[in-house]
Amino acid sequence: MDFIRTLHGDISKEELGFTYSHEHIVCRPAYWQERGEDDLLLDDKEKSKRDVLDFKQHGGRSIVDATAVDYGRDVQAVQEIAIETGIHIVGTAGFNKSFLWDAKIKEELKPLTGDYASYAQWIEAKSINELADFVIREVEEGLEGTPFKAGQVKFGTGYNRITPLEEKTLRAVARAHHETKAPIHSHTEVGTMALEQIDLLKSEGVELSYLSLGHMDRNPDPYYHEQIASTGAYMSFDGIGKIKYAPESSRISLILELVRKGYEDQILISGDTARKTYYKHYDHGLGLEYIISKWVPRFVDEANRCGFDGRKLVEKFFVSNPASCFSFKK
């Protein structure tokens, strides 16, 4: 029977409800911490929790926290937020992109990773299968030595390139997926290298209906999006609210173009809210409430004007598609 794995246990697909598919809730990325980039440190549990409560008060039910081991997870804090707010939170095993790996591994992780100074040294030293075993344990036993298990496995690649170490983690994540049946999520830098990621996953025998590709709206190319969608993978439009990259009209146009081509069952929506200045209760940003309270009504209006049923599409993007995408299909 299919199920969703959250930080507080496995639930049925029907329990997931309205879902943001790619967020960050509490994290202290070592790479940014070492460089004094305070805006990228979501380091106050109570402030993060207040934003999660805003999301809940507007009808939100679940959040996928896409924070991997190399991005400074605080598993305990995020699990406590899930319990205290009543929101389902899906945790993430695996890895991010390689430029983050110059950072030092925190001491409390070394019993799990080994005594390596940096993430790059660890990943280089281990075999693909050893890295896969690490990811499998995060899904089946718990994240970072806690009893709280990951509900998806993740890898990442860089801008217009895939380094040898990134390919190594991709293959490790693919093998962990085969062992656990966990859904796979990928970081694409500025929406690039998705097709190359897909080719590598296919070489590992991955069925692409298990895959969601992040940051698709950062590369606003309808032809490229159609090529990706035709593989059967899910596409995450997770830059909602980030007008510095593109206006909302651009994202909505890209999404509706995929709907016109018949790919509405493969679209996921979120905000990738990973800075203090994006959060309402850290620094007066739009906050986690923005998509559900402001963007959704606008999308419904634009979709209806274009001849679609906007409400039906919202139900797909935020409820039925996440329930399918993030399922363990046993």
List PLM regions with ranges.
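Short acidic/histidine-rich active-site segments
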Residues: 184-185, 237-240, 263-285
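Active-site gating loops and adjacent loop-to-helix segments of metal-dependent hydrolytic enzymes
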Residues: 23-46, 97-128, 271-296
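Alpha-helical scaffold segments that flank or form the walls of functional sites
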Residues: 17-26, 34-88, 128-148
